[in-house]
Amino acid sequence: MSDATQALGKISIDVQRCPVDILTCSAHKLYGPKGVSALYIRQKRGQRVVELVPQITGGGGEEGIRAGTLNVPGIVGFGKAAELAKKSLESERLRLQMLRDYFEAELAQLAQIKINGIESPRLPHVSNVSPAA
């Protein structure tokens, strides 16, 4: 399982190439509607590779995974936010990476701060800092 919420709209996510059986993400990270999320469950030969136990039962919606009425306006809003984010994915990645690098360069001037993982592959908008030893 992967919670891809922080990656959504920042890097390309291809569930066919990603080695996960379950992936979740939330619309608000794309400036979409709050309270709207997506759940991807990998299928092989038309069957889910992971079976989920419903937390809310009743009704036949959501393939029996969750009861209740679909939030159609929220789902449409999530789709539109994803469409817009995809159009600006590369420019947003570069912008965030530039801001992160600037932030870390400023922090590097402080003796009491250690920046962790600078040489590691990482998301363009994530910094990891700690007190210097």
Predicted features and spans:
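Pyridoxal 5′-phosphate
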Residues: 1-133
